[in-house]
């Protein structure tokens, strides 16, 4: 009922409220108070493979792409705050130097889980801070489960783990009600 834009454009838009905000007047280059209706936008995406290979810039560009989409929603929105989440494999082998895991993790093309958590968190925060969007909350999951498959005679060990990391980036923004939708362009229109 309150959804204005969903599953099209670069981000979703939901119904907001009238409020006073300070906006830049593009003609005078001065900030002016504006009493208008502002709606909320939300965008989320993952940047898993780049973050697994090179955590700091992988997470940085994940946040950057999501911020770009928030800014380009409709005829242009503003960013407010972000969230970041990480799901990685077992971090105990790094923390306690458990040798039985080292050969396995050294053969992966991804970084070790603890390295991903630290460097990806730094990268996501770095990009948001540089552009003026704080990451105000997030989540972290580290999981490895070892089970015995009792469905066969061999009682095979089964391991369940995040071998490929998940890097989640989400953010809220605001957009003027009159900017919810892009205009249709014709050939020769000036942008």
Language-model features, listed with the residues they occupy:
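Glycine/proline-enriched, intrinsically flexible loops and inter-domain linkers
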Residues: 1-191
């Amino acid at each position: 009922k309150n959804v204005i834009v969903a599953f099209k454009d670069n981000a979703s838009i939901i119904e907001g409220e009238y409020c006073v905000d300070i906006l830049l007047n593009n003609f005078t280059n001065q900030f002016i108070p504006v009493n208008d209706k502002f709606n909320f936008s939300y965008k989320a995406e993952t940047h898993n493979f780049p973050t697994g290979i090179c955590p700091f810039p992988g997470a940085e560009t994940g946040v950057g792409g999501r911020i770009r989409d928030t800014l380009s929603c409709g005829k242009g929105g503003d960013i407010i705050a972000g969230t970041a989440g990480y799901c990685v494999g077992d971090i105990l082998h790094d923390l306690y130097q458990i040798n039985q895991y080292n050969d396995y993790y050294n053969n992966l093309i991804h970084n070790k889980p603890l390295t991903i958590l630290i460097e990806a968190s730094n990268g996501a925060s770095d990009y948001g801070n540089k552009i003026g969007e704080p990451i105000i909350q997030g989540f972290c999951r580290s999981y490895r489960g070892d089970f015995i498959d009792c469905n066969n005679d061999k009682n095979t060990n089964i391991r369940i783990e995040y071998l490929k990391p998940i890097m989640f980036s989400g953010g809220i923004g605001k957009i003027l009600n009159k900017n919810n939708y892009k205009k249709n362009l014709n050939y020769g229109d000036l942008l």
